[in-house]
Structures are given as structure tokens and as C-alpha cells.
From Swiss-Prot:
Keyword presence, Ribosomal protein: yes
GO MF, one example: structural constituent of ribosome
The entry's keywords: Acetylation, Cytoplasm, Endoplasmic reticulum, Ribonucleoprotein, Ribosomal protein
Gene3D superfamilies, A to Z: 3.30.1230.20
Family: Belongs to the eukaryotic ribosomal protein eS21 family.
Modified sites of kind N6-acetyllysine: K81
Protein name: Small ribosomal subunit protein eS21
Length: 83
């Protein structure tokens, strides 16, 4: 919900799983959120930006989280396509 100024005023904004696009429930204590830092290719230093991936507990329970994170990282260009 937004107020007249266009700011979000909700107390709880649900997250979505990056792999399955499911809403991560508030009581899903098995879910994770990980930030992968973007680095400068020439210097190898952190440039202040990162990619955020959220994985729900159901994906982790099936043992598919590592494949999902690798697939998402390849799509974002963090990992090379021929890895």
C-alpha cells in the first residue's frame, strides 16, 4: 500500500523466491536470502553493488538450491555460461 507521497507504508512486504517465484511466507524459517557482491573486473574490488537471491524452504528441502543459485548467477552474468 502506498500513501499520497508514493512511499510504501506496509508493515510487512513479502519476499519472493528467485528460483520458483513463490511468495516466501513469514514463518518459512528454512528460507535464505543471499547477497552476491559485484566486483570490478580490472581491480577485483567490490564496487558497492550486489545481486540479491531469495530461496524458499521448499527448494532447499528438495536439495535444488545450489542448482537454482548457479542458474540464476549464470543468467545475471556473475558466473560464466560454460561453467
Amino acid at each position: 500500500m502506498q500513501n499520497d507521497a508514493g512511499e510504501f507504508v506496509d508493515l510487512y512486504v513479502p519476499r519472493k523466491c528467485s528460483a520458483s517465484n513463490r511468495i516466501i511466507a513469514a514463518k518459512d524459517h528454512a528460507s535464505i536470502q543471499m547477497n552476491v557482491a559485484e566486483v570490478d573486473r580490472s581491480t577485483g574490488r567490490f564496487n558497492g553493488q550486489f545481486k540479491t537471491y531469495g530461496i524458499c524452504g521448499a527448494i532447499r528441502r528438495m536439495g535444488e538450491s545450489d542448482d537454482s543459485i548457479l542458474r540464476l548467477a549464470k543468467a545475471d552474468g556473475i558466473v560464466s555460461k560454460n561453467f
